[in-house]
Every structure is written in structure tokens, then in C-alpha cells.
A protein has these predicted regions:
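A short beta-loop-alpha structural element at the N-terminal edge
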Residues: 5-18
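Acetyl-CoA-dependent GNAT
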Residues: 28, 32-91, 102-103, 108, ...
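Conserved catalytic-core motifs of GNAT/GCN5-like acyltransferases
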Residues: 68-71, 76, 118-121, 133, ...
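C-terminal "cap" of GNAT-fold acetyltransferases
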Residues: 80, 145-169
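A structural signal for short, well-ordered beta-strand segments
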Residues: 84, 117-119, 159
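Conserved beta-strand-loop-alpha-helix junction that forms the acyl-donor binding cleft
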Residues: 93, 119-129
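Conserved acetyl-CoA-binding loop-helix of GNAT-fold acetyltransferases
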Residues: 94-107, 130-134
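Conserved GNAT acetyl-CoA-binding A-motif
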Residues: 109-121
Length: 169
């Protein structure tokens, strides 16, 4: 059963928990090629402010997860295309937090005219692949041996969600 949560804009005051959840995801090994969470300044600079959202437990106020986007390119033709990251605290997984974050992200990006949300996910991260499929993402390809992590070449599944309301004209 999903616990009562609130999805709200990410705040600078969330930096500690956001980066801790990020680092825990990186430490688990199937979230990213990165091994170290960035500084808050680097995170804040890279992510679009209008689409940085946090999931907070209604009863405790604890930050349970977050989602944020970055532009995929500075070229104007890609103005409506973003790449997202979604991370959920290990203790909150399986409770609907990731689904709520993705739904809120879809709503915020569509309201801003974003027509495509992309993500690259390791094929071993089956929970994330299922989460994205349920949120309307589809696999558009597999980037084979995209990069090396800890001496092992890894594939990345490229997913996208095309808006049904933004970018249609």
C-alpha cells in the first residue's frame, strides 16, 4: 500500500537528503556510470529548476525520492526534449514513490511544452525498467557496451516517453 506522500518542488534545503539518496543509488551499482554524487552546486546548475521534484512522507516529512531533468542539447530543435533521473530511497522502494514522481514529472514537463522525456537505464535495473514501462515509456534501443564501469563494459537501454499533448503541432 502506498504511504501518503506529497510531491513538491525540490528546495535547496533538500540538498543533503537528495545527494544522500543519489549516492546510495550510485553505490548500489545499477543506477549510473557515475560513482560519486555531484556537489549541490553542480547538481543545481545541471538540472532544470522547473522540473526538480521531491517526494516527501506526509507523516514524517522525510524526503523519500526525487526526480530531475537536464536538457539533452542546446540546439533549438531539441528544446522540448529532456533526460531525467529518478532516485528513490531504498527504504521507500515498492511503495509508489517512483511512480508518483514520474507522473508529477510528466505533468510538469507537458505543461511546459516538453514533448519527449528520455532515460538511459542499465538492463540489469529491472525495477526501473518496469517503473518506466508503467509510466508510458518505451524502449527505443539498446546502446551496447556504451561505457566501462569497474572494468566491465555495460549496455544501456534507451527509453523515451512521447507526450500525447505537447509538441503535437
Amino acid at each position: 500500500m502506498a504511504e501518503p506522500i506529497t510531491i513538491r518542488p525540490m528546495l535547496a534545503a533538500d540538498a543533503g537528503p537528495v545527494l544522500a539518496i543519489y549516492q546510495a543509488g550510485l553505490d548500489a551499482g545499477d543506477a549510473s556510470f557515475e560513482t560519486q554524487a555531484p556537489s549541490w552546486t553542480a547538481f543545481d546548475t545541471a538540472k532544470l529548476p522547473a522540473h526538480r521534484l521531491a517526494a516527501v512522507a506526509d507523516d514524517t516529512g522525510d524526503l523519500l525520492g526525487w526526480v530531475a531533468v537536464s536538457p539533452v542539447s542546446s540546439r533549438c530543435v531539441y528544446a522540448g526534449v529532456v533526460e531525467h533521473s529518478v532516485y528513490v530511497d531504498a527504504a521507500a522502494r515498492g511503495r509508489g514513490v517512483g511512480a508518483a514522481l514520474l507522473q508529477a514529472l510528466i505533468e510538469s514537463t507537458e505543461a511546459a511544452g516538453v514533448w519527449t522525456i528520455e532515460s538511459g537505464i542499465f538492463p540489469e535495473n529491472t525495477a526501473s525498467l518496469r517503473l518506466h514501462e508503467r509510466a508510458g515509456f518505451r524502449v527505443v534501443g539498446i546502446r551496447e557496451r556504451l561505457g566501462s564501469q569497474h572494468g566491465r563494459w555495460r549496455d544501456v537501454v534507451l527509453l523515451e516517453r512521447r507526450s500525447t499533448v505537447a509538441g503535437l503541432s
